[in-house]
Amino acid sequence: MKSLLFTLAVFMLLAQLVSGNWYVKKCLNDVGICKKKCKPEELHVKNGRAMCGKQRDCCVPADKRANYPAFCVQTKTTRTSTVTATAATTTTLVMTTASMSSMAPTPVSPTS
């Protein structure tokens, strides 16, 4: 009986401490979701902090933007990752070509 009461007490404490995804705060008439950061495909609401608080932004999925076009702003994305990936690919190609030419008796021209 004591172990049953202890188990129930633990579950009741965990239900209060761990919210997980049981409650998601909504904003903009239940269209947006309050998050710390919006995904690149989601739209950021200009005055979302008034609805979600200081630490969170109101993020609206791109397919629901037509409902609230005046409030939504497209989030800025950077292309630094693409440039880095291109540079890494070029470096890999140069290294592969150099290692292939040192292994082969005659140099092989790379095809693009």
Swiss-Prot record:
Keywords, sorted A to Z: Antibiotic, Antimicrobial, Cleavage on pair of basic residues, Defensin, Disulfide bond, Fertilization, Secreted, Signal
Disulfide bonds: 27-58, 34-52, 38-59
Primary site of residence: secreted
Secretion signal span: 1-20
InterPro entries: Beta-defensin
Chain intervals for the UniProt region annotation (In vitro binds to LPS, mediates antimicrobial activity and inhibits LPS-mediated inflammation): 21-63
GO cellular component, one term: extracellular region
Keyword Transferase: no
Subcellular locations according to the entry: Secreted
The keyword Disulfide bond belongs to this UniProt entry's keyword annotation: yes
PTM (free text): O-glycosylated; glycans contain alpha(2,3)-linked sialic acids.
Biological process annotations from GO: defense response to bacterium; single fertilization
Stated family: Belongs to the beta-defensin family.
Primary role: Highly glycosylated atypical beta-defensin involved in several aspects of sperm function. Facilitates sperm transport in the female reproductive tract and contributes to sperm protection against immunodetection; both functions are probably implicating the negative surface charge provided by its O-linked oligosaccharides in the sperm glycocalyx. Involved in binding of sperm to oviductal epithelial cells to form a sperm reservoir until ovulation.
Subunit structure: Homodimer or homooligomer; disulfide-linked.
Record's protein name: Beta-defensin 126
Organism, scientific name: Hylobates lar
Gene, per the UniProt record: DEFB126
